[in-house]
Amino acid sequence: MFNYEELFQTYKTPFYLYDFDKIKQAFLNYKEAFKGRKSLICYALKANSNLSILSLLANLGSGADCVSIGEIQRALKAGIKPYKIVFSGVGKSAFEIEQALKLNILFLNVESFMELKTIETIAQSLGIKARISIRINPNIDAKTHPYISTGLKENKFGVEEKEALEMFLWAKKSAFLEPVSVHFHIGSQLLDLDPITEASQKVAKIAKSLIALGIDLRFFDVGGGIGVSYENEETIKLYDYAQGILNSLQGLDLTIICEPGRSIVAESGELITQVLYEKKAQNKRFVIVDAGMNDFLRPSLYHAKHAIRVITPCGGREISPCDVVGPVCESSDTFLKDANLPELEPGDKLAIEKVGAYGSSMASQYNSRPKLLELALEDHKIRVIRKREALEDLWRLEIEGLEGV
């Protein structure tokens, strides 16, 4: 059992705490699921891009799914090889494209004809041939939160099959483009196997037709991964997920690329916070803690529910419903409504669970609140993997603007 009290003697709340053994096992589970087939697991940095987490995954052989030049540079800094990096995203700038091509990453996932032509122009100016993949929008409902559904025709992502074919043929004729992969990503937090299997089958058929047209595909890039059980939902078994993809690729000699993020890191993380006050208003009980929505946005943005565990021993205290809220000046700064928790006192410690994904990576300095300390638990030892920002860090990049005023 982990001794939190020793931790609290050294580190002040709030802070993130990650169990690196859980991250390692989650990644190895993906490798095992695709064992026996040429595959590359490209961790999606958007879930959590802490350098120490990336370094851990790099040492396990991970690639990287990146959506900005900043993420690409983070991946490289952590030791992920350029030939294991794919660059996705609907709005890559010309600067980002040029930098990615100069770094000789594995390929760029292209999301529009205009982007394809931009890549061609930049590749020509560099005198190189750009490896590209085209993201196909299969128009399949992922049955997930609408904010993270990405595979329907009304979503901004990817292109329809007809346009994809035109883009592949254009790229095939170009002296500066090399089409090497097909790509699709229907959404995040998938809890139903059928949509991902259907999408895989549909895009696999497209891949076969492209190969028949003489396009030398080498990769089959499946965006995303399986969902996480935040509220005791039934989740997809990783073996079934992998088999659904593998079965769709019968007759195709392509390397599978899988891009999990949430399912690698979510369950590893806790946000440790302490009670500041309790109050009642209109018979409503509020527990006010020192972490805020700027530190962990998912409950406010997606109405996501994360279990909250009381760390401080509270035996014998009366249990009743309460809203656990933060100090930010927004009514949406609420971590959990109607949580059944014991009567709490200032200084009592709580853990908000399964926050390893889309926690620190979505954090901000809203209300001029410094970003949090991040700790890793590895081999029964604690180490700092991100220092807490100082107050001075809030305005460090603005000081020059005061000169001469």
UniProtKB/Swiss-Prot annotation:
CDD domains: PLPDE_III_DapDC. GO terms for biological process: lysine biosynthetic process via diaminopimelate. SUPFAM superfamilies: Alanine racemase C-terminal domain-like (SSF50621), PLP-binding barrel (SSF51419). Specifically catalyzes the decarboxylation of meso-diaminopimelate (meso-DAP) to L-lysine. Belongs to the Orn/Lys/Arg decarboxylase class-II family. LysA subfamily. InterPro entries: Ala_racemase/Decarboxylase_C, DAP_deCOOHase_LysA, De-COase2_C, De-COase2_N, De-COase2_pyr-phos_BS, Orn/DAP/Arg_de-COase, PLP-binding_barrel. HAMAP family: LysA. Keywords: Amino-acid biosynthesis, Decarboxylase, Lyase, Lysine biosynthesis, Pyridoxal phosphate. Its EC number is 4.1.1.20. Substrate binds at R262, R298, Y302, E330, Y358. The active site is at C329 (proton donor). The lineage of its organism: Bacteria, Pseudomonadati, Campylobacterota, Epsilonproteobacteria, Campylobacterales. This is Diaminopimelate decarboxylase. It is an enzyme of class 4 (lyase). Pfam families: Orn_Arg_deC_N, Orn_DAP_Arg_deC. The keyword Thylakoid does not apply. The modification N6-(pyridoxal phosphate)lysine is found at K46. One of its GO terms (molecular function) is pyridoxal phosphate binding. The gene is lysA. Homodimer. Pathway: Amino-acid biosynthesis; L-lysine biosynthesis via DAP pathway; L-lysine from DL-2,6-diaminopimelate: step 1/1. Its cofactor is pyridoxal 5'-phosphate. It comes from Helicobacter pylori (strain J99 / ATCC 700824) (Campylobacter pylori J99). Pyridoxal 5'-phosphate binds at G225, E259, P260, G261, R262, Y358.
